[in-house]
């Protein structure tokens, strides 16, 4: 494709964008459906602090397709755009730009100053977002956007929280939760699950000395930094443990029996002392590894506890427990009254209690801790292990699990409601419902919603010194309690508000909400529910449709479900499409640093937004699978789908204008069989599109487009070309024009939701004066059942299967399509052969064969050979396969032909018989000299390849036509221009030209031919003969 084509595509789409904008087409689509049933849609809010990428364009395209379709199908579809404004993504950008990276830097800078800086950059890339949203062809309402930082939105978030609190679903507690030391705040479980990486971590086995010199307990860990906080060890009471003596050191060790070979692979290296049960170890005491918390022994620390979660598949069967840094450790120690110590600050550094490592980052301390243990003879093994480890989804730093005081939503209390809500949601793809999302719901944990951050919606809890709480659910309530006018709900506006009530002073707790709480509340907060637009909000709840990426099964889809199930015992949405991840072509994550992908703007400038949309929609990424993005794939869509469609339109326009066809004058037209076929194919496609869209299956909706465009351009138009060229105003020509007009108009509406630019271009070139102004203002077409003719479609499918089979034979045996052959034999069932007998001439034309013979038996020129399909039959018959092979080799042709018809046969192996079907047999053919054969699913084709002199001469004539018409196109001649030819060629080519002069002149609009004896003009190879032409346009 040349640069001119690329420029014209981009320019044409820009022109259509201008048309939509100038004529306010999007608003007219809304006005057009005012009063119709509402199709409600929630748009997952992006952050405008980063530029949009292919993932955003993909999700935006999916949303746009569904909303456009719903609008054309008779629904009012409001499409408000929303912005996620709060949280770490914004804070992190400000911290970096202002250099506020040290602990306490934000407080010194001032929370008010910091939050106002956050407010300033929230819409840093809003213009770029609007550009890309528009350029991809997506329609959204930017004039009515909602923002999570707006006062109205934040007030509704408070209402949601207060409602949860009133239902007893909010509590304060200390739990071990995922913690980002880079951010200094806890994260939710679903945030922790979003960014796992394969990493190499330390792997150490530590020697814990039992009291009174009774040997050592061996415990394995990948987090040596937690060993300074060890408070207990745990064993499984039902497992068997062993005591052995290491011959080299003389030390006695206790570990799980099943793990013994892992750590002592050499049986000669130790002396067996005996077995003991886990239960017998419970309650025993051991010496602390480090001196920092020895005083906790009096409070119950440094004991062996029972724990039934221990497995021996890895480790030693004995688990080291640091209750501040492991959820299972925390609960086990809590149950047995073991004290908790947490000598790690919010930046992940040791506090003063660990005097030897104070101020050191915990992950950096791993080596020093292992070194110290080794020096003190407390280290049994040191190595590394590769495993999956969670990283902060925003800062890409390693997470830890840390006991913190936090506020929680009691998700586990409403788990049954969430599972019930999920049952009524239609998921695409369907496996996510009970798979990734359903399993996540089943394992749902209480949600830590408080964050030690600044730029977010403050948690509306005021607490008195004696612990009494006031939970505020509205601005009016806060104003009434505080006596102050509230103009903003961010921290720096309300942190200093003190409420005095009943002789007590209440101050707000110093936390903001997890920003996922904001987005989970958007169905209500976007409309300031319940303070405004309550009826509208309730009427549109649950949403008819949402769509986002696979990661949102543990993000937005989840938080929406938590809040909707808890507050309303309903799902938040009825239908959801989940897309996969777009990777770079090399399979890696797209990276600006690595420059491993082309920019979206470059792709749309080069190939157009429609090509990008269709490439994405027709890929596995809309089925929640990963896609390796390829610009060649986008280019292929343009070349193989969109340009042929444009060419079909250009063909119609050219000849309709040439002959003055008026689509309104189509009464009493008798359609040809090929007309009825393409219309039947069109309305069958329409039915499939409607069915697929009802199931939100965009891949299934789009996939048939490609085949239909092939049917239209490479079969219907090509086969009907002469009908359009008919100089007389015949009924057949009018039928062809009428059919092609109907197909193009209806198809432009079918594809409008998916590829909105080319559909608009088609429609604008076809629409009449009284038709709607835009294709997107049209109703989506309905199926016309009487035009669907399944038998005719099946018949045409058979014809095309035979033609494809014949062409594959020609290609395989290097027989040019333009070289005529004398005979082709088509073998199939009697019923099908009889149905196809009337179209022999059509097949002959397509295959360039003079005589087409339909047979129910393989002709004498071919012998059918069969042998076992070793892959499938080997599983069925095992070692009897050689016997079957011999039996098949001896079968007569009559039996083989019977098998070819029935698809089954019975083979006798002595007294036993075995039934075989088509999948058990491999078929091939041995052809007589001059013949070649091949089969498809339904037919066998046998080509007679023998060339006679007349066939050779006709082949030369056809090559001449092809080359002359190529020169016409290259010379930019109009389709109706007449030409004169000067020809230099050898005698055989001159003879072929003379013999087929009428055919050649008619096909090329040639009025005169003169043979010259010198080379002139462009030179061509015509079946091995050097020929040159000069073409000149002739005035009529």
Swiss-Prot record:
Q: Which reaction does it catalyse?
A: tRNA(Ile) + L-isoleucine + ATP = L-isoleucyl-tRNA(Ile) + AMP + diphosphate
Q: What class of enzyme is it?
A: ligase
What cofactor is needed? Answer: Zn(2+)
Q: Which GO terms describe its cellular component?
A: cytoplasm
Which InterPro entries does UniProt cross-reference here? Answer: aa-tRNA-synth_I_CS, aa-tRNA-synth_Ia, Anticodon_Ile_ABEc, Ile-tRNA-ligase, Ile-tRNA-ligase_type2, M/V/L/I-tRNA-synth_anticd-bd, Rossmann-like_a/b/a_fold, tRNAsynth_Ia_anticodon-bd
Gene3D superfamilies found in the cross-reference section: HUPs (3.40.50.620), Isoleucyl-tRNA Synthetase, Domain 1 (1.10.730.10)
- EC no. given is 6.1.1.5
List ligand-binding residues for ATP. 592
Q: Name one GO biological process term.
A: isoleucyl-tRNA aminoacylation
Q: Where is this motif: 'KMSKS' region?
A: 589-593
Q: Which GO terms describe its molecular function?
A: aminoacyl-tRNA deacylase activity; ATP binding; isoleucine-tRNA ligase activity; tRNA binding; zinc ion binding
Which comment does the entry carry about domains? IleRS has two distinct active sites: one for aminoacylation and one for editing. The misactivated valine is translocated from the active site to the editing site, which sterically excludes the correctly activated isoleucine. The single editing site contains two valyl binding pockets, one specific for each substrate (Val-AMP or Val-tRNA(Ile)).
Belongs to which family? Answer: Belongs to the class-I aminoacyl-tRNA synthetase family. IleS type 2 subfamily.
Q: What is this protein called?
A: Isoleucine--tRNA ligase
Supply the source organism for this entry: Chlamydia trachomatis serovar L2b (strain UCH-1/proctitis)
Gene encoding it?
A: ileS
């Amino acid at each position: 494709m040349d640069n001119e084509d690329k420029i014209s595509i981009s320019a044409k789409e820009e022109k259509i964008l201008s048309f939509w904008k100038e004529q306010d087409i999007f608003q007219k689509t809304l006005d057009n459906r005012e009063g119709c049933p509402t199709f409600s849609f929630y748009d997952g809010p992006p952050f405008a602090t980063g530029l949009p990428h292919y993932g955003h364009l993909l999700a935006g395209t999916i949303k746009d397709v569904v909303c456009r379709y719903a609008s054309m199908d008779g629904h009012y579809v409001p499409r408000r755009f929303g912005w996620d404004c709060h949280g770490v993504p914004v804070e992190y950008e400000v911290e970096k730009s202002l250099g506020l990276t040290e602990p306490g830097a934000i407080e010194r800078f001032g929370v008010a100053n910091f939050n106002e800086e956050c407010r300033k950059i929230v819409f840093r890339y809003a213009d770029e977002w609007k550009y890309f949203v528009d350029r991809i062809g997506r329609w959204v309402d930017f004039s009515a956007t909602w923002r999570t930082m707006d006062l109205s939105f934040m007030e509704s978030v408070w209402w949601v929280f207060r409602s949860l609190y009133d239902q007893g679903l909010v509590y304060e507690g200390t739990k071990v939760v995922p913690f980002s030391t880079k951010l200094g705040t806890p994260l939710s479980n679903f945030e922790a699950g979003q960014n796992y990486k394969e990493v190499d971590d330390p792997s150490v086995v530590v020697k814990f000395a039992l009291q009174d010199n009774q040997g050592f307990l061996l415990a394995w860990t990948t987090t040596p930094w937690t060993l300074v906080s060890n408070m207990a060890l745990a064993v499984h009471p039902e497992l068997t443990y062993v005591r052995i003596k290491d011959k080299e050191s003389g030390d006695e060790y206790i570990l799980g029996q099943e793990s013994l070979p892992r750590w002592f692979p050499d049986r000669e290296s130790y002396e067996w002392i005996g077995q003991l049960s886990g239960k017998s170890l419970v309650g025993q005491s051991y010496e602390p590894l480090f001196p920092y918390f020895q005083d906790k022994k009096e409070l119950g620390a440094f004991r062996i506890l029972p724990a039934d979660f221990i497995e021996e598949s890895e480790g030693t069967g004995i688990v080291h427990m640091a209750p501040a840094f492991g959820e299972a450790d925390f609960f086990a120690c809590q149950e047995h009254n073991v004290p908790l110590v947490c000598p790690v600050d919010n930046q992940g550094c040791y506090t003063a209690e660990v005097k030897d490592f104070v101020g050191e980052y915990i992950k950096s301390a791993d080596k020093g801790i292992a070194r110290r243990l080794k020096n003190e003879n407390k280290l049994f093994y040191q190595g590394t292990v590769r495993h999956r480890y969670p990283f902060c989804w925003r800062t890409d730093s390693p997470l830890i699990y840390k006991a913190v005081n936090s506020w929680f939503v009691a998700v586990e209390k409403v788990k049954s409601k969430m599972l019930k809500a999920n049952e009524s949601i239609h998921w695409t793809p369907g496996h996510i419902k009970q798979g990734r999302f359903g399993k996540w719901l089943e394992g749902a944990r209480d949600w830590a919603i408080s964050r030690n951050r600044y730029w977010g919606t403050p948690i509306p809890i005021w607490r008195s010194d004696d612990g009494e709480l006031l939970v505020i659910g509205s601005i009016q309530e806060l104003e009434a309690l505080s006596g102050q006018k509230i103009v903003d709900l961010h921290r720096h506006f309300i942190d200093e508000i003190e409420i005095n009530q009943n002789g007590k002073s209440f101050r707000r707790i110093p936390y903001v909400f997890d920003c996922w709480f904001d987005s989970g509340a958007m169905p209500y907060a976007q409309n300031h529910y319940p303070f405004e637009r309550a009826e509208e909000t309730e009427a549109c709840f649950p949403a008819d449709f949402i769509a986002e990426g696979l990661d949102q099964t543990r993000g937005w889809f989840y938080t929406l479900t938590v809040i909707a199930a808890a507050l309303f015992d309903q799902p938040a949405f009825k239908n959801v499409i989940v897309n996969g991840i777009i990777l770079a072509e090399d399979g890696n994550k797209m990276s600006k640093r690595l420059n491993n992908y082309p920019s979206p703007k470059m792709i749309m400038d080069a190939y157009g937004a429609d090509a990008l949309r269709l490439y994405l929609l027709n890929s596995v990424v809309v089925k929640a699978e990963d896609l390796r993005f390829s610009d060649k794939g986008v280019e292929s869509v343009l070349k193989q789908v969109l340009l042929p469609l444009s060419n079909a339109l250009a063909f119609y326009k050219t000849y309709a204008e040439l002959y003055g066809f008026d689509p309104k004058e189509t009464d009493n037209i008798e359609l040809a069989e090929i007309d009825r076929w393409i219309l039947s194919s069109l309305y069958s496609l329409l039915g499939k599109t409607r069915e697929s869209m009802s199931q939100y299956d965009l891949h299934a909706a789009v996939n048939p487009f490609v085949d239909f465009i092939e049917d239209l351009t490479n079969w219907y138009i090509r086969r009907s070309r002469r009908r359009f060229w008919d100089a007389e105003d015949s009924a057949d020509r009018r039928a062809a024009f009428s059919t092609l007009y109907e197909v193009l108009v209806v198809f432009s509406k079918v594809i409008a939701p998916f590829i909105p630019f080319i559909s608009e271009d088609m429609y604008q070139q076809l629409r009449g004066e009284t038709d709607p102004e835009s294709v997107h203002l049209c109703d989506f077409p309905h199926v016309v059942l009487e035009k669907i003719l399944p038998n005719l479609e099946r018949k045409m499918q058979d014809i095309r299967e035979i033609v494809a089979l014949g062409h594959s034979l020609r290609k395989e045996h290097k027989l040019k399509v333009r070289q005529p052959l004398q005979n082709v034999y088509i073998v199939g069932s009697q019923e099908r052969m009889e149905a196809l007998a009337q179209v022999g001439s059509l097949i002959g034309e397509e295959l360039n064969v003079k005589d087409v013979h339909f047979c129910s038996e393989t002709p004498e020129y071919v012998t059918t050979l069969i042998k076992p399909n070793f892959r499938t039959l080997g599983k069925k018959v095992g070692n009897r396969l050689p016997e079957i092979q011999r039996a098949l080799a001896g079968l007569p042709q009559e039996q083989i032909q019977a098998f070819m018809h029935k698809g089954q046969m019975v083979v006798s192996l002595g007294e036993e018989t075995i039934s075989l079907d088509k999948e058990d047999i491999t078929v091939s053919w041995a052809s007589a000299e001059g013949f070649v054969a091949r089969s498809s699913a339904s037919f066998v084709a046998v080509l007679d390849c023998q060339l006679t002199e007349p066939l050779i001469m006709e082949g030369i004539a056809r090559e001449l036509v092809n080359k002359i018409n190529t020169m016409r196109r290259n010379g930019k001649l109009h389709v109706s221009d007449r030409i004169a030819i000067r020809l230099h060629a050898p005698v055989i080519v001159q003879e072929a030209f003379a013999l087929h002069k009428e055919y050649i002149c008619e096909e090329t609009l040639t009025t005169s031919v003169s043979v010259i004896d010198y080379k002139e003009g462009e030179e061509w190879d015509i079946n091995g003969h050097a020929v040159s032409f000069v073409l000149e346009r002739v005035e009529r």
